[in-house]
Design a protein with these regions (language model features):
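Catalytic zinc-binding patch centered on the HExxH motif and its immediate surroundings
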Residues: 142-143, 177-197
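A glycine-rich phosphate-binding loop feature that marks nucleotide/adenosyl-phosphate handling sites
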Residues: 14-20, 72, 118-136, 170-181
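Short pre-active-site segment immediately N-terminal to the catalytic Zn-binding motif
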Residues: 140-148, 152, 159, 196-213
Length: 213
């Protein structure tokens, strides 16, 4: 799925808030969903999931294969279920998982109340998934470049000591970080390393406060 999602799938273009044709990518999809223009949010959401729908047979087969693989490994390793096997990697009892689900279900009314409040604040008759990400208050519009973010980070983490700050600065200035989104690049943000090398960070930076945090 990861290869299909990051390398093979291409999303269409839609008009942004300014009427400019912009191609949707994994990296900028959230920006469309945060738009104050509901039509932009709706168009972006439908464009992305219509694209995924074109690969539904491939995805269904991939999911089926993953389920069969998980069940096979659980069986040969003498686990009662694939769930028990998956949780065992982190030494988590199944009771903890069950309690988590039970607690979430118990407090669903609070989530429903939040959705009702969101509907009221946004002035909507009905809330759709693409309405869940747009801010309830006006964005400050503050833009933060990657270079500015580096300065904020170095200053903010200075209390951790000179050695920490020195290693952080070395990584930021010596290509330990793959910053910007690119075609075929994995979506999201990750850090990984191998024995004998410095760690590497993969991200898809956008000039906003959320990315700074």
């Amino acid at each position: 799925f990861s290869v299909l999602n990051n390398a093979d799938i291409t999303f269409p273009s839609i008009k942004d808030e300014n009427g400019k044709e912009t191609q949707i990518t994994h990296g900028n999809f959230i920006n469309f969903l945060e738009s104050s223009n509901r039509e932009v949010r709706k168009n972006a959401f439908e464009a992305v999931y219509k694209t995924y729908g074109q690969y539904k047979n491939t995805m269904a087969t991939t999911l089926s294969g993953t389920v069969k693989k998980d069940n096979f490994y659980a069986r040969v390793k003498k686990y009662k279920s694939a769930r028990e096997a998956a949780l065992s990697n982190n030494s988590i009892p199944e009771e903890v998982y069950d309690n988590l689900i039970k607690t979430i279900n118990k407090h669903l009314p609070l989530l429903h109340r939040y959705i009702d409040l969101r509907k009221k604040v946004l002035g909507l008759d009905e809330v759709h998934i693409y309405d869940l990400y747009t801010p309830l208050v006006k964005d400050s519009g503050m833009k933060v470049t990657y270079e500015e973010a580096k300065d904020y980070m170095l200053k903010g983490l200075a209390p951790l000591g000179e050695e920490y700050a020195s290693i952080l600065k070395e990584g930021l200035e010596n290509r330990w970080v793959d910053i910007y989104e690119n075609k075929g690049k994995r979506s999201g943000a990750y850090s990984s390393g191998t024995y004998g090398t410095n760690p590497y960070i993969l991200m898809n930076w956008h000039d906003n406060v959320n990315n700074l945090f």
